[in-house]
From Swiss-Prot:
Gene3D superfamilies: Winged helix-like DNA-binding domain superfamily/Winged helix DNA-binding domain. The gene is Foxc2. The modification Omega-N-methylarginine is found at R278, R292. Phosphorylation regulates FOXC2 transcriptional activity by promoting its recruitment to chromatin. SMART domains: FH (SM00339). There is a cross-link at K183, K213 (Glycyl lysine isopeptide (Lys-Gly) (interchain with G-Cter in SUMO2)). One of its GO terms (molecular function) is transcription cis-regulatory region binding. Residues 385-394 have a biased composition (Basic residues). InterPro entries: Fork_head_dom, FOX_domain-containing, FOXC1/C2-like_FH, TF_fork_head_CS_1, TF_fork_head_CS_2, WH-like_DNA-bd_sf, WH_DNA-bd_sf. The keyword Transcription applies. Keywords: Activator, Developmental protein, DNA-binding, Isopeptide bond, Methylation, Nucleus, Phosphoprotein, Transcription, Transcription regulation, Ubl conjugation. It comes from Rattus norvegicus (Rat). This is Forkhead box protein C2. It holds the Pfam family Forkhead. Transcriptional activator.
């Protein structure tokens, strides 16, 4: 504006200060040439403003009025119920209902004859409204209207927008019976506590019977029944029973059951047993040492916890005593593919399990050694001295075998090395981690450094791992399943 006016009238800048806008516009208004356009433009707003103000003045109040005059979303029954409930004695006359509705909702201030007629119809036609005769003490005209005591729950959650159903007096006995049925169970359970316990004991006894039948049907697999419907209380009740019937409760008593699994021809290795072993912690609550070490086992894993020892013990026993021990090497190394391969990196093993392993290095006190699971995995990974130590403990009647395993497993391990190269990558690590079972990796860098050191110092691996010949085929063969290990680089590069 300033530049435009200064160009059209350069004398204005000489008279008026440049930045004082009030003086500028006051001075600019004094010029004749400027006054005519200013007058035109200033006159038009006045003209249009006055004209619009006069012509549209009645309409300014109309948009506000329809907002007040919108019909409320309440039914006539809801309006009458509101009026009755807001009355001091929960009863109100017909005129009181009219007045309440008009005071609350301005929409009903007009067309009174129409909606008041509807109010009277609803009062007389609906059974939820009861007419109360007027007392003689209170002078006035008309009777009082009140709500039927059984119709107070007519609206859902106290909202007048929704009514459940049309209230009828003949439905009141049915409603009372339904309420009585709904109210009966809590006092019945409180009063009849002794009667409720046999009902609760019924399913538990049935579940126990199922477990007993499974024991009688297959003595080699005591508690392998999949009782998914076990409640936590039932599982806790069945836990002493399962620990008593499970032969893995004591290492010496586990021998006859483990060897009895062989004549049945049960497969020692299957996908189901692997997935069961992976989902449920090995060992369970069967050993008190596990509870001391802080192993947290869900109670529903109890029926599964006893099955893996009997399944894996058969190839474990065959691997030491029978000549064809290739099945043992395959099964135990394949088992390490799922459970043992992640252990050197301490990625998937919970810390409580590592503490349990470090607290019980070897011998009868180890909960996993008693179940013949973790010891077999670690032995299959390369710590064969530790492995034989466990098996000399688990088979006291057999003479302790030589430190070097029989030469028969080597072709089998070479044949299975195409998918177990990561076992070869890790085969020297158990010598450092599980043979002593006291060393842990504080960070990832030390883990990889120890891995390289173990590769360079092969003599150290041979001294601590008494089966160095098993490591060579795994170390030389490239891996197909590199992602199965926590680290995926090929050890032949280093």
């Amino acid at each position: 504006m300033q530049a435009r006016y200064s160009v059209s009238d350069p004398n204005a800048l000489g008279v008026v200060p440049y930045l004082s806008e009030q003086n500028y516009y006051r001075a600019a208004g004094s010029y004749g040439g400027m006054a005519s356009p200013m007058g035109v433009y200033s006159g038009h707003p006045e003209q249009y403003g006055a004209g619009m103000g006069r012509s549209y003045a009645p309409y300014h109040h109309q948009p506000a009025a329809p907002k007040d005059l919108v019909k409320p979303p309440y039914s006539y029954i809801a309006l009458i119920t509101m009026a009755i409930q807001n009355a001091p004695e929960k009863k109100i006359t017909l005129n009181g209902i009219y007045q309440f509705i008009m005071d609350r909702f301005p929409f009903y201030r007009e067309n009174k004859q129409g909606w008041q007629n509807s109010i009277r119809h609803n009062l007389s036609l609906n059974e939820c409204f009861v007419k109360v005769p007027r007392d003689d003490k209170k002078p006035g005209k008309g009777s009082y209207w009140t709500l039927d005591p059984d119709s107070y729950n007519m609206f859902e959650n106290g909202s007048f927008l929704r009514r459940r159903r049309r209230f009828k007096k003949k439905d009141v006995p049915k409603d009372k019976e339904e309420r009585a049925h709904l109210k009966e169970p809590p006092p019945a359970s409180a009063k009849g506590a002794p009667t409720g316990t046999p009902v609760a004991d019924g399913p538990k006894e049935a579940e126990k019977k199922v477990v007993v039948k499974s024991e009688a049907a297959s003595p080699a697999l005591p508690v392998i029944t999949k009782v998914e419907t076990l409640s936590p209380e039932g599982a806790l009740q069945a836990s002493p029973r399962s620990s008593a019937s499970t032969p893995a409760g004591s290492p010496d008593g586990s021998l006859p059951e483990h060897h009895a699994a062989a004549p049945n021809g049960l497969p020692g290795f299957s996908v189901e047993t692997i997935m069961t072993l992976r989902t449920s912690p090995p060992g369970g609550d069967l050993s008190p040492a596990a509870a001391r070490a802080g192993l947290v086992v869900p109670p529903l894993a109890l029926p599964y916890a006893a099955a893996p020892p009997a399944a894996y013990a058969q190839p474990c026993a065959q691997g030491l005593e029978a000549a064809g021990s290739a099945g043992y090497q395959c099964s135990m190394r394949a088992m390490s593919l799922y459970t043992g391969a992640e252990r050197p990196a301490h990625v998937c093993v919970p810390p409580a399990l590592d503490e349990a392993l470090s607290d019980h290095p070897s011998g009868p006190g180890s909960p996993l050694g008693a179940l013949n699971l973790a010891a077999g995995q670690e032995g299959a990974l390369g710590a064969s001295g530790h492995h034989h130590q466990h098996h000399s403990h688990l088979h006291p009647q057999a003479p302790p075998p030589a430190p070097q395993p029989p030469p028969a497993p080597q072709p089998a391990t070479q044949a299975t090395s195409w998918y177990l190269n990561h076992g070869g990558d890790l085969s020297h690590l158990p010598g450092h981690t599980f043979a002593t079972q006291q060393q842990t990796f504080p960070n990832v860098r030390e883990m990889f450094n120890s891995h390289r050191l173990g590769l360079d110092n092969s003599t150290l691996g041979e001294s601590q791992v008494s089966n160095a010949s098993c490591q060579l085929p795994y170390r030389a063969t490239p891996s197909l399943y590199r992602h199965a290990a926590p680290y995926s680089y090929d050890c032949t590069k280093y």
